[in-house]
Amino acid sequence: MPKHSKRYLEAKKLVDRTKYYDLDEAVELVKKTATAKFDETIELHIQTGIDYRKPDQHIRGTIVLPHGTGKEVKVLVFARGEKAKEAQEAGADYVGAEDLVEKIEKEGFLDFDVAIATPDMMRVIGRLGKILGPRGLMPSPKSGTVTNEVAEAVKEFKKGRIEVRTDKTGNIHIPVGKKSFDNEKIKENVISAIKQIMQMKPAGVKGQFIKKAVLASTMGPGIKLNLQSILNE
């Protein structure tokens, strides 16, 4: 088992592991347990009831948080001509075509958080699947990152649109703010995220879709949420 720091163990004492916290109390507590010397990210971890062995139950999509994540998002766009110009004007950090593909392949360039591509670029960037796929960076129509509306996509991801996907255990992990955020902003982000994820329930999932939700800071312990109180908001 990994050894936890003294700071983590002290923070853990503040959390009742048997309790499901209402959101107001959970947000207060997650900030209290975020004791690192940097502005910790507040994360939402969701356990779903999907069967990961069934590909039609995998979840991949995007949601928009009303107050963003507090993180500066670096956006890369694969596009040519007019679409490349639109992406640049919308604020994309990197725009290119074959030149960017080569930079990623040969130099291992990965200094970006989101990659967007116009549909005509997919045959060019297909060979990047092995590099970008495992990192969750490969453009995909499901996540809204393969589109001709590049300017709109760039602006949305810069503003706070984030990708949601289930890992191999059927869990979802997303940032919902920073410790420095007002409590109300974190709370509104959490409510919005859970309600949007509820809309992504695959048709084949039987029984309860969201089984458990936990709030935690980067270096802090998990705080279980009372889901019913959130869904009633």
UniProtKB/Swiss-Prot annotation:
Entry keywords, A to Z: Repressor, Ribonucleoprotein, Ribosomal protein, RNA-binding, rRNA-binding, Translation regulation, tRNA-binding
UniProt-listed GO biological process terms: regulation of translation; translation
One Pfam family named in its UniProt record: Ribosomal_L1
GO molecular function, one term: rRNA binding
Superkingdom of source: Bacteria
InterPro entries: Ribosom_uL1_bac-type, Ribosomal_uL1, Ribosomal_uL1-like, Ribosomal_uL1/biogenesis, Ribosomal_uL1_3-a/b-sand, Ribosomal_uL1_CS
GO cellular component, one term: large ribosomal subunit
Subunit comment: Part of the 50S ribosomal subunit.
Family matches, as NCBIfam families: rplA_bact (TIGR01169)
Protein family according to the UniProt entry: Belongs to the universal ribosomal protein uL1 family.
Function comment: Binds directly to 23S rRNA. The L1 stalk is quite mobile in the ribosome, and is involved in E site tRNA release.
HAMAP family membership: Ribosomal_uL1_B
Name of the protein in its database record: Large ribosomal subunit protein uL1
Organism field: Thermotoga neapolitana (strain ATCC 49049 / DSM 4359 / NBRC 107923 / NS-E)
